[in-house]
């Protein structure tokens, strides 16, 4: 769903509570459960005091990945409430908004495109003209993650993108240094490298798979996969299921380790 141009919309957030509430209700949850889920999500995504962006982002990821544990009423057994239907991608509400104005302290910023799943901002894309390098978009994303800009908005963001029509799409996660933003290299029928990579990485099932299966939090650093690591893992998984052996052939610097 296209949510529109949110440049002048008030109250833009990384959790659009009305959308999330409606989706949770469509999954059969009552108002009491939904309010408790929203309260937990709001608490865990907050940055402040000893809680840094990495900590809040990891806490939100745990809620996304493993569900929110909610006790409906006193004395009742806890239930796991899922914020995302990982098994059935089409059962989720996917939406994008452009020019999303986010109020910061003291500076306000406006990400080009935000990808929402069930009302939760999970991806952000900075797009540049072909005459402006993708690195400019990467640095813009990194600046936006600073405390003086809109750091709080990135507490739910799982994948960070930047690109242009000539260089294609680069991807990383929160805190990824500019030099580690990677180009997604996959053959396809679309000639334009930016359109091709966005279509490949942001396809519903692929987007959720990358978040669910290809993100790690390693000693204070959040990481995601390169293209070859993604396809190598899928091939290895298929062989393991079929009880077949094999060799994954790597070259120096190809990402054998995290």
Model-found features: residue ranges?
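ATP-dependent helicase/translocase motor core
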Residues: 2-258
């Amino acid at each position: 769903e296209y949510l529109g141009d949110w440049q002048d919309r008030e109250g833009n957030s990384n959790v659009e509570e009305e959308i999330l509430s409606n989706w949770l209700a469509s999954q059969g949850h009552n108002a009491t459960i939904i309010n408790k889920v929203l309260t937990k999500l709001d608490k865990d995504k907050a940055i402040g005091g000893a809680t840094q962006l990495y900590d809040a982002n990891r806490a939100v990821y745990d809620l996304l990945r493993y569900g929110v544990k909610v006790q409906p009423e006193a004395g009742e057994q806890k239930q796991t409430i899922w914020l995302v239907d990982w098994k059935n991608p089409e059962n989720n509400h996917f939406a994008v908004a452009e020019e999303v104005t986010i109020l910061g302290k003291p500076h306000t910023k406006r990400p080009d495109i935000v990808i929402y799943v069930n009302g939760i901002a999970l991806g952000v894309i900075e797009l540049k003209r072909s005459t402006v390098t993708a690195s400019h978009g990467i640095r813009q994303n990194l600046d936006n993650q600073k405390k003086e800009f809109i750091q709080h908005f990135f507490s739910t963001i799982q994948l960070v993108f930047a690109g242009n029509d000539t260089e294609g799409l680069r991807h990383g996660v929160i805190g990824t240094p500019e030099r580690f933003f990677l180009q997604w290299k996959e053959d396809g029928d679309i000639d334009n490298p930016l359109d091709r990579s966005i279509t490949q990485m942001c396809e519903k099932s692929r987007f959720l798979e990358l978040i669910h299966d290809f993100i790690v939090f390693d000693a204070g650093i959040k990481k995601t996969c390169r293209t070859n690591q993604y396809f190598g893992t899928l091939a290895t998984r298929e062989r393991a299921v079929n009880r077949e052996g094999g060799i994954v052939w790597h070259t120096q610097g190809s990402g054998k380790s995290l």
